[in-house]
Amino acid sequence: TEIGDSEPSGNVPSFTELPNHPLLVQVGSQNVMEQMRPDLAEKGVIFTDFASAMEEIPEVVEAYFGKAVSYKEDRLAASNVASFNSGAVLYIPDNVEIDVPVEAKFYQDSESDLPFNKHILIIAGRNSKLDYLERLESIGDGNVKVTGNLSIEVIALEGAQVKFAAIDRLGEHV
């Protein structure tokens, strides 16, 4: 997806000056941007919202969803599975190395009462390699209190190397 000449609206930050690295941006439960280098897409790398992943690679999602964080583990995990309203799936096929960071930006709108319940599923195929950076941030001037329940599953198959970093800057009302 490419950015056009449209202006950002409301609390959505501008993304027109972004480098060409794999990137997914969500505000609330909506995708506002997906960016994938053509060479990585040709190798089968997928980075998209959960609903789209269920359409594109349902067998992969079904095989690994809940394997690292089972809903049977505790009430918080069960609540996440029952109530997540958005999220993402990153799939890297076997033997694919990504030489630039993969980045996810998840924005919680502080003026919205939509719960911030996300499920992130990262599947790194055999002998794949990637660096993943996740940013969670509240935006806006509101002070609406909402719940937040995030579950992040990283499935690293044999020989896979995954470096994971997260920066959380959620507001005090989440």
Identify what each model region corresponds to:
Residues 1-174:
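Glycine-rich and polybasic anion-binding loops at the starts of cofactor/ligand-binding domains
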